[in-house]
Structure formats: C-alpha cells, structure tokens
C-alpha cells in the first residue's frame, strides 16, 4: 500500500487543496504540519527548498500544482476529457500567475515592511492584479452552465479557486460586488 506524507506549513495555504483531494479520494495520508521555525531546519533537505512537499513511499515531490494535478488525476478531479483537463490546467495557471503577483505583497506583510510601502504595493500591484483575476474568473463562470469552472462536475480548479477566494475574503481583499464569484463560493 502506498504511503503518502504531505509536508506543509501549519496554516491554510498551498497545501489545503492537496488535503481536500486526499479527503475527496478517501485516501489516508500523513498530514505533517511544519512551523516557520521547523521549516528553517528542513529547508535544505527539500527538493526545491519550499513547501508543500508530497512524499510518496520515500520519494519527495515539490510544487503544489504538480502535486494537485497528480492527485486530481488519481481521484477523478482533473476533468472528464483531455479538453477539460486542459481547461482545468489553464485555470490553475491563472491562479499561479495571480499568486506570483500577490506573493510580493504577502512577503512585505510577513517581513514587516513599512506601512507606506505595503499601501503602495496594495494600490499599485495587488488591486490591479485582483481586478484582472476577477475579470478572468467571471468570464469563465459566465460561460459555465453548471456553476463549476469546467464541465458539469467538481474539479481541483474549483477547489483551488474557492480556497483562494476564501483567503481573499479573510484578509479583506475580496470585493463583495462580485456576484458570480460569491455564488461560486457558496456552491462549493
């Protein structure tokens, strides 16, 4: 029997959707949560020096999108057809592109940048990125007849985007004036 060990920070984050895929697939796994202090000593032993990492029978794999894609294929959440799989991958790439931009602001916050710098980043980087991200997500949802992002069933793109939008709500960067996105979150 395969042994899965998920290593990720002890917060909601890029490991959350991976956890959800394990639960949806009804697959047991070791959920190894790492504090920021513990991460310092683990970092040099990780494939890319980052978390999350999925260890499968002793083999470590990094990069949340690769892990998510693998598990989604294993448990039936990657799309029903090759075209749907490509659409799901496209939405995951949209999320990753947004996160690259958002990450700059996140690091400024956790590393204690001065308020004026965080406000500048929020105005010049984060808000325009969120606007473009929401425009793209709304277009996808408006084309959908099912309320899911792709096809008629839940995919890991739905999980990833819903988790991300929930995080944006929690940190007060989500605009309530996005009716399609709000309906989407409530659906999931």
From Swiss-Prot:
Cysteines engaged in disulfide bonds, as pairs: none
Catalyzed chemical reaction(s): RX + glutathione = an S-substituted glutathione + a halide anion + H(+)
Transmembrane segments: none
Assigned protein family: Belongs to the GST superfamily. Sigma family.
Domain GST C-terminal: 81-188
Domain GST N-terminal per the UniProt entry, residue ranges: 2-79
EC assignment: 2.5.1.18
One BP annotation, GO: glutathione metabolic process
EC top class named in words: transferase
Organism: Caenorhabditis elegans
Recorded superkingdom: Eukaryota
Protein name: Glutathione S-transferase 2
UniProt xrefs under InterPro entries: Glutathione-S-Trfase_C-like, Glutathione-S-Trfase_C_sf, Glutathione_S-Trfase, Glutathione_S-Trfase_N, GST_C, GST_superfamily, Thioredoxin-like_sf
Coiled-coil ranges from the UniProt annotation: none
């Amino acid at each position: 029997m395969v042994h899965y060990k998920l290593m990720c920070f002890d917060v909601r984050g890029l490991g959350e959707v991976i956890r959800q895929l394990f639960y949806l697939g009804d697959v047991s796994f070791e959920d190894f949560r790492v504090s920021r202090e513990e991460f310092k000593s683990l970092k040099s032993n990780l494939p890319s020096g980052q978390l999350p990492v999925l260890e499968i029978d002793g083999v470590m794999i990094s990069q949340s999108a690769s892990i998510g894609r693998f598990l989604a294929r294993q448990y039936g959440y990657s799309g029903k057809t090759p075209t749907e799989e490509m659409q799901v991958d496209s939405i995951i790439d949209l999320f990753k592109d947004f996160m690259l931009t958002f990450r700059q602001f996140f690091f400024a916050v956790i590393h204690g940048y001065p308020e004026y710098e965080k406000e500048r980043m929020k105005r010049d980087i984060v808000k325009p990125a969120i606007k473009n991200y929401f425009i793209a997500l709304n277009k996808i949802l408006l084309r959908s007849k099912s309320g899911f992002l792709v096809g008629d069933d839940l995919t890991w793109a739905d999980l990833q985007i819903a988790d991300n939008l929930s995080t944006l709500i929690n940190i007060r960067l989500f605009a309530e004036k996005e009716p399609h996105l709000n309906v989407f979150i409530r659906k999931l």
